[in-house]
Amino acid sequence: MAASDDSSHYFTEFTLSEIVDMENLYKELGDQSLHKDFCQTVASTFSCSVNRNGKSSITWKQVQIWFQEKLKHQSQPKSKTLPSPPLQIHDLSNPSSYASNASNATFVGNSTFVQTRKGKASDLADLAFEAKSARDYAWYDVSSFLTYRVLRTGELEVRVRFSGFDNRHDEWVNVKTSVRERSIPVEPSECGRVNVGDLLLCFQEREDQALYCDGHVLNIKRGIHDHARCNCVFLVRYELDNTEESLGLERICRRPEE
């Protein structure tokens, strides 16, 4: 019997964070990522990571094969048929790796999410990511990554559990477009770091819902204040519905610096 060309067994050796790292490396380096020396460095870095405690080490060959498969998928012409089922699903549940945080959201009725405002930056130690829900296109803190799958199109999806919600509200989300490092609440002493044109995560309060949505800064009315209280006003336009609103510092979070 001919050997299967399904390469999913190579992908299942990696954790989600390792795949995200390799996605970014491939985006920067392209086919240069196939070089043996580079793959050895990546494999050594992954194997020495604390996230690999209790897991087998990664070999440079596994890393190289991952990049080869990525390059192959990128080179293939787009098919006109519907995408095939996912290549694999891998269990990432690990209580020691992903710490749950106190509830920052509640579920109301059958379909309405209601979020509370984020805390201080010092509260972010255990929650590193946020994900965008397909239900309302709002961003929620991620409590844990449960499984992931690599589609035949090469896209990576992960199943997330949102902080403050149970497994009934778990979702598959696209890693590239709907998962990112958690936004950071802006302290009064940091308001000068927010500029016109910046992308912010904004707390949008409406009569029927309260959501965290992306918005761009259109204008800033800066006031004189001390490090303990900020009276600046930020005019933002929400990406969700293209409406504009003036917000105080307590209703905005900045994106981490790259």
From Swiss-Prot:
The SAWADEE domain (138-244) binds to mono-, di-, or trimethylated H3K9 histone peptides, but this interaction is impaired if H3K4me2/3 methylation is present. One of its GO terms (cellular component) is nucleus. Changing residue 130 to A: DNA methylation defects. The lineage of its organism: Eukaryota, Viridiplantae, Streptophyta, Embryophyta, Tracheophyta. The gene is SHH1. Keywords: Metal-binding, Nucleus, Zinc. Zn(2+) binds at residues 191, 225, 230, 232. Transmembrane segments: none annotated. Disruption phenotype: Loss of DRM2 controlled DNA methylation, but no effect on CMT3 or MET1 controlled methylation. Changing residue 232 to A: Decreased stability of the protein. This is Protein SAWADEE HOMEODOMAIN HOMOLOG 1. Pfam families: SAWADEE. Its main location: nucleus. It is found in: Nucleus. Associates in vivo with Pol IV but not with Pol V and this interaction is not dependent on its H3K9me binding activity. Glu-130 and Asp-141 interact with the H3K4 side chain while the H3K9me1/2/3 side chains insert into a hydrophobic aromatic cage formed by Tyr-140, Phe-162 and Phe-165. One of its GO terms (biological process) is DNA methylation-dependent constitutive heterochromatin formation. One of its GO terms (molecular function) is chromatin binding. It comes from Arabidopsis thaliana. Associates with the RNA polymerase IV (Pol IV) complex. Interacts with NRPD1, NRPD2, NRPD3, NRPD3B, CLSY1 and CLSY2. Involved in RNA-directed DNA methylation (RdDM). Required for the silencing of some endogenous RdDM targets and accumulation of 24-nt siRNAs, but not for the production of Pol V-dependent transcripts. Functions in transcriptional silencing through both DNA methylation-dependent and -independent pathways. Required for both maintenance and de-novo DNA methylation. Plays a role in the recruitment of Pol IV to genomic regions associated with K9 methylated histone H3 that are targets for RdDM. Residues 138-244 are annotated as: SAWADEE domain.
